[in-house]
Structures are given as structure tokens and as C-alpha cells.
Regions:
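Membrane-embedded translocation segments of transport machinery
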Residues: 2-7, 11, 169, 173-321, ...
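Inter-helical loop and helix-membrane interface segments of multi-pass membrane transporters/permeases
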Residues: 5-8, 36-41, 74-95, 108-165, ...
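Select transmembrane alpha-helical segments in multipass membrane proteins
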Residues: 10-21, 45-49, 87-101, 147-152, ...
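Transmembrane helix-boundary motif of multi-pass solute transporters/channels
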Residues: 13-53, 238, 249-252, 256-259, ...
Length: 457
């Protein structure tokens, strides 16, 4: 392995890493994506499969990526290249580096939508945003969506510009505790609504009759998105981790944080939907629109829906920011390492890419609505490309790279450095060498085949 001598930024300690990594995980993936997938794909059975995958596949990938980052002190491309040139190092390094560059633009578009809704609730417009057609009218208005998207992007870039400790870590330490408190308050409020207990049961109690292969595919895709694996973030954050920080303990804390917020998000939204609609199947199948169409209707039916709306969308805004910050940092770190640029110059370049690609997604439901890629709007296509295609490929490349090039013994040495624990060592070894690459390959083929209509799931 090539030596790394360049002075590199770092987190102040375990708390800084955990909150920043958790912030990457606890983003729109948990608050926006997880509840609508759980509602759509069987509730409790989806949750059970997700937890099993997170504790096995997710654990393995977090450990591998964080270890790679810490032992090399480099972003994805450099981390993979540190062990020589091979097809796995080239593929693994660059695909991990490119994924965040493609995700953060459309992630920021959704962040802009959240910002718009928060402003409307602060202005006391709980009833107008709940009206039929409001959301579709908003996203089809290219000017409004573009302005909201740009404002959200500028906030993200300003935090990245400030650096690791002054920007990312400081913001994560501020926002994550508030996010947890807001989650608990809203979840308690939601589950105490009349008729909500049926939603709690649907979400928490597995029903095998709701199981399908698509439930597994959806849970797997959500795990990639939610835990921020196979997208270079954990390699980048691992490169900022101090040697004395326990990788396994940090991984466990991220798992707990992520799963707890995912469950809390489900309890915020699904019981409220049941209380409002009685568990209407069409409402549960609403998909991505669940948060922007159904939830405002739920709030409008409440006595103090404006307050609930402000609290909820403030929470979602914080979650959106933490994930966009992590994604942007991964991209900026790659520019710094591979191009030798300063953080300021790298942030500006990343900003240009964000605005250019994000504008396609932002305008994709308005002026560019007739422009589609394989039948998908720009935002849907970028989500499919990254989540269903590139992330499984990145996971396969990372697994093969770790097991065949780096060697699992090196990972074990990095994890146990300074007396660090490796309690799930056997799980890690079996998953990284066998199950993870095979399972990721099956998910990749299933997702592509389903998208092109070759199979129906």
C-alpha cells in the first residue's frame, strides 16, 4: 500500500464521526424514502427484512468502507488506488466517487421541495398545501422549484466550504440531537391519533402474506440509500477518523441511530395515514408523493395542523441537509485528492455540477416534462441509475476488492488496531467474501430486469 503523508482533516473524535456518519445515513433516505417504501411493500415484513439486511450486509459494508478510508487516509479513488492498479481498484474507486456526484443534485431538488413546504407552513398555509393538485402544480412550475433547489444547494455548499470540523461536524452536532427530539415528539403525536394503532400494527408486526421478492429488492435498495453504503461517503468519513476511534463501536452506533430514526419515521407517517384514511390501499401505495400530498392532508385534518406541519418539515429539512452535506463532502474530497485542488476550488466545481444536473431534475416535471430517459423523468432516472444499478455494482466491486486485493486480514488489523473490538468477525468474513457480492448481483439483475419490463415484481 502506498504511504499517505499529506496532512488530512479529521473529526475531533468518536462523537464527531458517529454524528456525521449518522447524519449521512439519517437523511431523506430515512425520513422521506423509508416510510413510503414500508407503506408500499408490506409494513412489518419490509421492516423485518430491512433490519436483517442492515445487521448483516449493512454492517459488513460499513466496516469495510470505513476501514479502507482510515487505513489509506484518502477519498474513494485514492483509497482503492493505494493497493495497486487492478480492474477492481479502478472500477471500485471511480464508481464510489461518481455516485455522490449524481445523487446530491436530485437529493437537493427534493430538499428544495421540503424548504418550500416548510416556508408555506410557517406562513400559516396548512390548508392550501393540502389541496388536490398543489404539489403537482408546484413541481411543474419550473421557476419556483428551481429557486428552492438553488437556495438549498447554496446552504449545503456553504457548510462544505467551512470544512470538516467547522462545517460538517459542527452542523451535525447541532442538527442531529434536534432531529431526534423532533422525531420523538412527532411520532408520539402521530401514534396517539384516533385510528392510528392499526397503522402501528401494520408497520411493526410482520405479515408473511405481504411478502414478495420486490419487498427484498426494495429493502435492499433502501439499505444502500439509508446507510450511505456503496457511495463513497463512509470511505471519505473513514479517512477523517482518528486511529484511536473504534471502527466497530462506531459502526454499531451508526446502525442503532439509523434504524431508530427509520422506525421513528415510519411511526410518524404510517399511523397518521391510517388515522386519516383508515389504511386505504391506494393511499399506502402513494409512493414518493406520500410525504408531499398525503401528509399535508393529514395535518390539515388536525386541530393544529400548521404547528405539526412546521415541526415535521423542519425535521425533514434537517435530515435533507445532513445527507446532502455528506454526499457533497464525498465529492469535494475526491476533487481535492485527485485533482490536487483546494477545498474552496473543489467546492465551487461541485456546486457547478450540482446546479447543472440538479436543474434537469428540478425542471423535469415542468418545462422538461416531455424529455424522458427509458420512460423516466430525470429525477426518477437518476434515482434508478444510482440506487438500483451503480450502488450494487459499487458494493460488488468493494467486496471483491477487499477480499481479493486488500485481504480480509488487513481489514481485521485495522479494525482491531489499539485494542479495537471485532465481535462480528465471522459474520463480516462470510458476508464480504460470499453473500454480499452474490446478493448485490441478484439485486442488480432483478432491478434492471424489472425496469425494462423483462420481469414483473
Amino acid at each position: 500500500m502506498k504511504n499517505q503523508t499529506t496532512k488530512r482533516s479529521s473529526f475531533s473524535g468518536k462523537i464527531g464521526f458517529v454524528l456525521s456518519a449518522a447524519g449521512a445515513s439519517v437523511g431523506l433516505g430515512n425520513i422521506w424514502r423509508f416510510p413510503y417504501l414500508a407503506a408500499k411493500y408490506g409494513g412489518g415484513i419490509f421492516l423485518l427484512i430491512y433490519i436483517i439486511l442492515a445487521l448483516t450486509f449493512g454492517y459488513t459494508m460499513i466496516m469495510a468502507e470505513t476501514s479502507l478510508g482510515r487505513m489509506t487516509k484518502k477519498s474513494p479513488v485514492g483509497a482503492f488506488a493505494s493497493f495497486g492498479n487492478s480492474r477492481w481498484s479502478s472500477l471500485g474507486g471511480w464508481i464510489n466517487a461518481i455516485i455522490p456526484v449524481l445523487i446530491v443534485p436530485y437529493d437537493s431538488v427534493i430538499g428544495g421541495w421540503v424548504l418550500k413546504y416548510l416556508v408555506e407552513y410557517v406562513r400559516g398555509h396548512a390548508q392550501p398545501v393540502a389541496e388536490d393538485g398543489y404539489f403537482s402544480a408546484f413541481i411543474s412550475d419550473g421557476f419556483s422549484t428551481e429557486i428552492c433547489f438553488v437556495i438549498f444547494s447554496v446552504i449545503t455548499l456553504a457548510i462544505i466550504y467551512a470544512g470538516v470540523r467547522n462545517g460538517i461536524e459542527r452542523v451535525s452536532k447541532f442538527m442531529m440531537p434536534i432531529l431526534v427530539v423532533l422525531s420523538v415528539i412527532i411520532a408520539i403525536y402521530s401514534v396517539t391519533r384516533p385510528g392510528a394503532l392499526a397503522g402501528v400494527k401494520y408497520f411493526l408486526v410482520p405479515n408473511i402474506s405481504n411478502f414478495s421478492w420486490m419487498t427484498v429488492v426494495a429493502a435492499m435498495g433502501q439499505m444502500f440509500y439509508s446507510l450511505s453504503i456503496a457511495m463513497g461517503i463512509l470511505i471519505t468519513f473513514g479517512s477523517y477518523m482518528k486511529k484511536e476511534t473504534s471502527i466497530e463501536e462506531s459502526t454499531k452506533n451508526v446502525e442503532i441511530f439509523d434504524t431508530a430514526i427509520a422506525i421513528m419515521a415510519g411511526l410518524m407517517i404510517i399511523p397518521a395515514v391510517f388515522a386519516f384514511s383508515g389504511g386505504d390501499p391506494d393511499t399506502l401505495q402513494a409512493g414518493p408523493a406520500l410525504m408531499f400530498i398525503t401528509i399535508p392532508k393529514v395535518f390539515a385534518s388536525m386541530g393544529f395542523g400548521t404547528f405539526a406541519g412546521v415541526m415535521f418539515f423542519l425535521l425533514v429539512l434537517f435530515a435533507a441537509l445532513t445527507s446532502s452535506i455528506a454526499l457533497t463532502e464525498s465529492a469535494v474530497s475526491t476533487f481535492e485528492d485527485e485533482l490536487g485542488w483546494s477545498r474552496k476550488k473543489s467546492t465551487v466545481l461541485c456546486g457547478v455540477i450540482m446546479i447543472a444536473l440538479g436543474s434537469l431534475s428540478s425542471l423535469g416535471y415542468g418545462p422538461l416534462a416531455n424529455v424522458k430517459i427509458i420512460g423516466m423523468q430525470f429525477l426518477d432516472f437518476f434515482d434508478f441509475l444510482t440506487n438500483s444499478v451503480m450502488m450494487p455494482i459499487a458494493a460488488i466491486a468493494t467486496c471483491l476488492f477487499v477480499s481479493r486485493v486488500v485481504g480480509v486480514k488487513r481489514i481485521e488489523e485495522e479494525v482491531t488496531y489499539g485494542g479495537g473490538t471485532f465481535k462480528r468477525r465471522k459474520v463480516f468474513l462470510f458476508m464480504i467474501q460470499y453473500l454480499c457480492p452474490i446478493f448485490a448481483g441478484i439485486i442488480l439483475l432483478s432491478s434492471v430486469a424489472n425496469a425494462f419490463g423483462w420481469i414483473s415484481m
